[in-house]
Amino acid sequence: MQVKVNLENNTSYNVYINELEKLNFDTKVVILTNELVAKLHLDTLLEKIQAKELFIIKIKDGEEYKNLQTIEYILNQMCAYKLDRKSLLISFGGGVISDMGGFVASIYQRGIEFINIPTTLLACVDASVGGKTGVNNKFGKNLIGTFYQPKAVYCESRFLKTLPSRELAAGMAEFIKMAVVFDETILSFLENLNEDKFLNAKLDDITLAQIIQKSIELKASVVSQDEKESGLRMLLNYGHTFAHVIENQTGYKKYLHGEAVAIGMNMANVLALNLGLLSEQECQRVQNLLAKFKLPISYKISNTHEFYNAFFLDKKTHFQKINFILACGLGKACIKNDISKEDILRTLEVFA
């Protein structure tokens, strides 16, 4: 099963679903992974790879390590291994690894090729596809980064079988995001999906592959039309404006990214409801679906004005205008940058 991401300037690539066979490289290869993934799956991957020379860099697991300090460590290791411009980097892990691996590949010797092999559902359905790379700093999430496309992406169901239910649910949040923004029919599919099988990693490979394929097809279509996020691609940030503030305020430790996105989607829906863009029934339907997959939908805001001011560090804020991605009915979304401060604060007060 393959999905093509069509891009200009000879940067198109394929996403392969359950098609990882032998990978042979006539160059030096470095695998970037974390300690947990290495323990669970690295031996399986190593059986698939042949290279002129093969190196492994392991980092600690967690969003709190997605920073410039870790990037410097990775770059120093790559220099020590004498990797050159013809070398290849393989990002083998979740969204944090794919974000950092892509960023490192984009800046090491001004750019080397890289491949994503995601090991979380969230990375399969979202983070590993599209070319967004980056790290966090004390001011916010992904404020330092590049657009840099992978050479290929390999999504394998076998690597998802060891995921705890919380990680699977976090990935589902990004799929629900796609449904609300682009395709209402997915909501019905998910409402009929057996959540117990899904959350216990017992969903059959065919259904799991269908979820991954559908999400990637939607994202590939968007990225093909708007690679650098100048318009249409911004819709993929539905829920993220709120989520990034939540993640930053909690030090990237309390919530997985998908969990923060779930809360952010609910907050965005409350704002859309208050503006008359979304009905109460539609808002409730999304809430119910998030709850079905054991995702959080609420966050206690201690200071609404502080939360509001954090929006101005969001990458979608232009000329001091906050661009909110809101559902305008289910299956479609819109960008709103003319919402009054009063309306925004009124929504934040619901969660205070």
Swiss-Prot record:
Presence of keyword Transmembrane helix: no
Record key words, sorted: Amino-acid biosynthesis, Aromatic amino acid biosynthesis, Cobalt, Cytoplasm, Lyase, Metal-binding, NAD, Nucleotide-binding, Zinc
Pathway: Metabolic intermediate biosynthesis; chorismate biosynthesis; chorismate from D-erythrose 4-phosphate and phosphoenolpyruvate: step 2/7
Membrane-spanning segments: none
Enzyme class (EC, first level): lyase
EC number(s) per entry: 4.2.3.4
UniProt binding sites for Zn(2+): 174, 240, 257
Annotated family: Belongs to the sugar phosphate cyclases superfamily. Dehydroquinate synthase family.
Record's protein name: 3-dehydroquinate synthase
Organism: Campylobacter lari (strain RM2100 / D67 / ATCC BAA-1060)
